[in-house]
Amino acid sequence: MNVQRKLASTQLKPVLLGVLLATSAWSQAAPPEQARQSAPPTLSSKQYSVTSASIEALKLDPPKLPDLSGYTHAAVEAKIRRKPGGRIAAAMLQQTALKDFTGGSGRLREWIVRQGGMPHAIFIEGGYVELGQLARQLPANQFAETTPGVYVARVPIVVAPGATLHIGKNVKELRLSEERGAFLVNDGKLFITDTKLVGWSEKNNAPSAYRGPESFWAFLVSWGGTETYISRRPVASLGYNTSKAYGVSITQYTPEMHKRLKRPRPTGWLIDSVFEDIYYGFYCYEADDVVLKGNTYRDNIIYGIDPHDRSERLVIAENHVYGTKKKHGIIVSREVNNSWIINNRTHDNKLSGIVLDRNSEHNLVAYNEVYQNHSDGITLYESSNNLIWGNRLINNARHGIRMRNSVNIRIYENLSVVNQLTGIYGHIKDLSSTDRDFKLDPFDTKVSMIVVGGQLTGNGSSPISVDSPLSLELYRVEMLAPTKSSGLTFTGILEDKQEEILDLLVRRQKAVLIDPVVDLAQAEL
């Protein structure tokens, strides 16, 4: 089913400060940040040509969206195999699923201190187990029911391969004790439905309070080969700055362990739930086909949603992401490819609303409402071959859409209005003096884009600005002048080309191709 949600209208103040162009125009007003960037030599206006482009070649059908109708609470419940026979055992922490958290004497010592002796964990093995069974079979210093339906885990819980743990509607709340160092590890199948999962301070009898990135918070991690399903309940107060302990994580094992275990990639559905006050609201690494649908991510610490390294075919849809305290609302980073970021609402985040980062390609970013973020609406860093379609980018503190060192970016039918800098901004930046690993995260100082349809209105410095593009194609974009007193004018490399551009775009209703008449590689010599 190809359902394209018609985004709710947003009330905008009228912007009547310039001339409305019927089709498109291009502005080269460089935002202030550009002067501070180290970049390869740029080309002058004499080194660019303006010609008519093929309108037919720019035609593109609306993108086909994935069918979301099957991702429901009922479908999650139907996946649970309630086969009896699961076993519960307490054992020492020295197990494969815990190696990342107990390796080295320093980390093991932490659990010894927290548990007051040689550390143990609870292991779910061999079949289906409901959470209430743990309280009936384990001592209170490991797991207890404190009030009817409210349980506290005082040691880590591990779901072993082949086992299923169901935390369901008979559980009001599962609390993971901060003082005792409890956390939840899925190495099999985990279902959390109609209940609450929270990091808990027994000392304060309250949810754990964030005290800094290095202070322990409980967390949930699901390893390679696992399935994780969270449906219709809140998750809160989890995660800290330790590998794979970021909050709610679905991740392949480390490369060394993966070579030995050869587990398939993990997957899962997180639907219709609330994730709040978590170090990373969501994190994944080398995960496939994960679905994040209909969730609220609010007031999380570093990121709201953060899929990472080589994850594929993710669906990030119909989520509400806001109030992220340190960085971005939604970010996909390092070769997160072939995924859908659609019909989300992301606003009031510390930096950008949506980010594609570090060679994340062949993704669709469509029909999102992105507004009042403290940096850009949508940002692309070193991420080429992506389609940006039908988004509404309103009143962001910097650019509506920004792309750096990214080529073949198709920007169709977007509304980018009253952003404080530019509606659409493309630029290059030389990153060679930074500390990034260029083998892992290569870059090329090139930018190119196609802009078709949509509207750029009332943005602070210019509708569109670009720095030394490989090529630009423009067609059928409505524009109002920026709020600056000089109105809508071409500057920079296109200043001398203004008459040619307007003649094609406005008078002759043509598509415009702007590209260099010299080889950019030669121009940099």
Curated annotation (Swiss-Prot):
One GO cellular component term noted in the UniProt record for this chain: periplasmic space
Pathway connected to this protein: Glycan biosynthesis; alginate biosynthesis
A single MF term (Gene Ontology): isomerase activity
Annotated compartments: Periplasm
Ranges of the PbH1 repeats in the UniProt entry: 287-309, 311-334, 336-358, 360-382, 383-405
Known EC number: 5.1.3.37
Keywords: Alginate biosynthesis, Isomerase, Periplasm, Repeat, Signal
Activity control: Inhibited by zinc.
Main localisation: periplasm
Superkingdom of the source species: Bacteria
Catalytic activity entry: [(1->4)-beta-D-mannuronosyl](n) = [alginate](n)
Catalytic center residues: 308 (proton acceptor)
Name listed for the protein in its UniProt record: Mannuronan C5-epimerase AlgG
